[in-house]
């Protein structure tokens, strides 16, 4: 970023990345009614729905935390959307993405994007694409990505990174 004339840096975080991902086939889980908080039992009308051994059965249709395939399903969907819009992963650097012709590149860490761009319209192109599918949060100062604090001085062409 500091070596590219006119470049800026911003961060994008996809909210509920795994939770928004539809699954090709549903999964099933059973949970003891005694392990479910009373407030959830009341809110979802679960009282009396348990079997004779106290189990309640659920069908999972969207990704959820703890589901082994949730990460790969979410990631595959995201990569497909990016590729459809002209983004591609750099051959030499896994996790670094570029666009075929736009002056933009980003590192992708699960659901966090560290975006270098020249011209806000190119950043907005990526932003619009992601907003089609997910709720997102942007950090235009680009001062925090994946738990890393970043200090930028673009005119002085220096950056400080700390954790």
Task: Give residue spans per PLM region.
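Long, low-complexity, charge-biased intrinsically disordered regions
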Residues: 1-163
């Amino acid at each position: 970023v500091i070596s590219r004339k006119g470049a800026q840096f911003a961060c994008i975080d996809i909210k509920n990345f795994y939770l928004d991902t539809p699954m090709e086939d549903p999964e099933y889980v059973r949970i003891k009614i005694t392990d479910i908080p009373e407030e959830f039992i009341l809110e979802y009308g679960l009282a009396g729905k348990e079997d004779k051994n106290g189990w309640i059965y659920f069908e999972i249709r969207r990704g959820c935390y703890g589901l082994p395939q949730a990460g790969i399903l979410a990631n595959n969907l995201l990569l497909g959307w990016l590729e459809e819009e002209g983004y591609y992963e750099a051959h030499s650097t896994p996790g670094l993405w570029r666009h075929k012709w736009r002056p933009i590149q980003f590192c992708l860490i699960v659901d966090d994007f560290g975006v270098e761009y020249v011209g806000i319209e190119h950043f907005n192109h990526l932003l619009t694409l992601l907003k089609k599918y997910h709720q997102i949060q942007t950090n235009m100062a680009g001062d925090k990505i994946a738990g890393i604090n970043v200090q930028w001085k673009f005119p002085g062409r220096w950056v400080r990174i700390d954790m």
